[in-house]
C-alpha cells in the first residue's frame, strides 16, 4: 500500500482517508458494502480501485443499484487479472500481476533461507505487471 501512497504524492493527488475503506479480500459482499459507503459520501470518488477482480464484481453491483453507470459516472479498476476479468462485460480494467515470476522468486528466496539460514538477508522483491485495458476506466476528470 506504500506504493499507492507514493503514487498519489508523485502525481500531486490529494490523500483522502475517507476513501480508504477496508473490505475482505476476494469477497464481493464486503466490497459491495464498502462501495455503498463510498457512494454515500458528499464528495464521491471518481474511481474505485478494488483489491482483486472478484471484489470488483460486488462493487459493480452496488454501483448499478445506486443508478450509476461505469465508467460514465464512476470508474472502477481491479487487481489480479483473473480469467473472469476478461469475461466480464464491460471488460474490466485491471492490473495483472505476474504470479509465475513472483512465485518463482519467492521459492528461490525460501530455498536460500533453508539452505543458508545464517547468511540469508530478508529482502523485498518487485515484479512488474501490466494493465489490462478494459472499458471500466474513463479519462480523468479535470
Q: Where are the model-predicted features located?
A:
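Bacterial carbohydrate/catabolite-sensing allosteric modules
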Residues: 1-142
